[in-house]
Amino acid sequence: MTASLLKAELHCHIEGAAPPALVAAQAEKYGIDASSFIRNGSYVWEDFTSFIAAYDFVASVFRTEEDFAALAEAYLIELAGVNTIYSELFVSPDHGEAVGLSAEAYIEGLAEGIVAARIKTGIECRMVIIGERHLGPENVLRRAKWLADYHHPLITGFNMAGEERMNRVADYAPAFDIAREAGYGITIHAGELCGAFSVRDALDLVRPSRIGHGVRAIEDADLVQRLADEGVVLEVCPASNIALKVFEDYASHPMRDLTDAGVRVCINSDDPPFFATSLANDYAIAASMGFSDVEIDAMTRTAIEAAFVDEATRQNLLQRLQAAGSGDEAAI
């Protein structure tokens, strides 16, 4: 049973973690009609394009520092309740700016929620700044430059998400160079909607230590071997992959094939209520796919080893995992 296992998550978009009931309440608070995006207590979307539209709507009903603080605190307390000891939240200041909130105010609100959750539960959390791919290379470059000049102790990484089929990875490489030179950890969404070539482009042009999703690397055996050889960690989101029809079902999901080939992976929920999942559920899904508790513990260790966090905190997290009877096996 995975319920008792300690957990860690590296891939979750904060607005995408907002439950429909909270979003409906926020919409009512601001006099916004949510009926096009929430029906019968669930989010309404049909494909990736409509999912992005629904996500943007959800983001639009959080409008103040207090709103974002409450969102971050609620999600982290939920995670802590299922034995999660570490979380990285993907945060996009573009969403704050879209509702008239400065990037700095957006971050400070989220940080307030993170600190409150840590005080109440002990969960550690860091933020990874997102550049939105579908807003174009210049916008992502602007975000990286902002990040290089804005130092916050809870911001430790840079990422790019959004519509993977727009533009070339090469168009965004300068933004990642800026973030890397400023000392931030690098991850990037690839190998989800697009095939193995997008993972290869990410490795060649962005040089990340982690890749968000990356599961379509399975289409290229040489690329799978390269991932294994280089130790790049895939942030795998099983329920998300099925909901977005990246794979037809869990039987055809390549997580087992990837781990058998020596690729390092960890378990994540992505945008949980959009995909009728949670981190606890994705851990249970991994078990249903045939992974043992020992293997799943190793994935949690991998997540902590790959986390964008200072070494003192990393070692503390690893010690907590060890003390719980986990982490004795070699990381997957």
Curated annotation (Swiss-Prot):
The record marks 213 as: Important for catalytic activity. Signal peptide: none annotated. Its cofactor is Zn(2+). One of its GO terms (biological process) is hypoxanthine salvage. The active site is at residue 192. Its EC number is 3.5.4.2. Binds 1 zinc ion per subunit. The keyword Zinc applies. The keyword Zinc applies. Substrate binds at residue 271. This is Adenine deaminase. It comes from Allorhizobium ampelinum (strain ATCC BAA-846 / DSM 112012 / S4) (Agrobacterium vitis (strain S4)).
